[in-house]
């Protein structure tokens, strides 16, 4: 099975400009290819991971990746299938975010070794050197307004309004392909299926300005079995930066993937062979309740993104919280595992009697209810049941001197911080 056949078997090929010519190029020699990443936030997220891992698969097959950071296009904003104009960022912010993208990409692509080591390029390097007049003369003349208006990404914004700034974005992305082709002989661009219009602007410019053929391959935008956009947890993006989404939170995200999606996601997001995945699927179908596919998915992706130690920690937090063994975890681990739990900052003047603190932290709605909860054995302090109405919290109740975990019943938690 050649690399293109494997990408197809994994569900990673959505659309290509000329499949036969692309397969020929990929099987006959080394292809230089690129994927663009606009610095629209200070971290990449799971939505980027499909293209990143596809790029890694191609590098492992011997092809040469170029990671293009959109230092210039990030200042403009891509209108593709966005309902409204993006907020413009400052040059300083875009520069800072561009630097963070390189660090994250180096976790997946090899920038150090071999003839096909990855290269990082920034389109600000060439756009900052070209004047507006030169851009119109040397690039703009190759694009008709009719051609630009025909793009679905533009059509969807015509009714609500699109600025010239965003309208011109596709020409800028097209020029990226031209520059990379002229400087590094890049002949293939990879991106999400929502980028098709911008990407083919590049092949059009290559054809008209340089009389060369470029290839485009889009990867699918991933949705779950319910058709919801993939990569968000509780409405928030799942980030690759551990400071924005902890390894534990990412582990939980994958662990909670629906059965209908689990095997498909193993093909897309892991480097397990298709044969290994087929074996997992057999065992998974025989005992869905054991969630083997989700557990494997969570292990593989968290290890890939954050490393083996982070995976082991996420697994340990999961197991200890499930068993109620709060004291087996450090304060740092509890902050990961209980990041979405209500937090109450204990004040110096607070009464630390168990009934008082239950009301202060909103675990119990009233003192009467708090007393009933304690007497009925529904209150746990760091995993241990408290039934003494006169119990007062002490230094011994502070884990690592930083926090105390209160639980009411089976599911209602609060974290007291000091």
UniProtKB/Swiss-Prot annotation:
It is found in: Cytoplasm. One of its GO terms (cellular component) is cytosol. Residues 352-418 form the S4 RNA-binding domain. GO terms for biological process: tyrosyl-tRNA aminoacylation. SUPFAM superfamilies: Alpha-L RNA-binding motif (SSF55174), Nucleotidylyl transferase (SSF52374). ATP binds at residue 232. A motif ('KMSKS' region) lies at residues 229-233. L-tyrosine binds at residues 34, 169, 173. It catalyses: tRNA(Tyr) + L-tyrosine + ATP = L-tyrosyl-tRNA(Tyr) + AMP + diphosphate + H(+). HAMAP family: Tyr_tRNA_synth_type1 (MF_02006). Homodimer. Catalyzes the attachment of tyrosine to tRNA(Tyr) in a two-step reaction: tyrosine is first activated by ATP to form Tyr-AMP and then transferred to the acceptor end of tRNA(Tyr). This is Tyrosine--tRNA ligase. It comes from Streptococcus uberis (strain ATCC BAA-854 / 0140J).
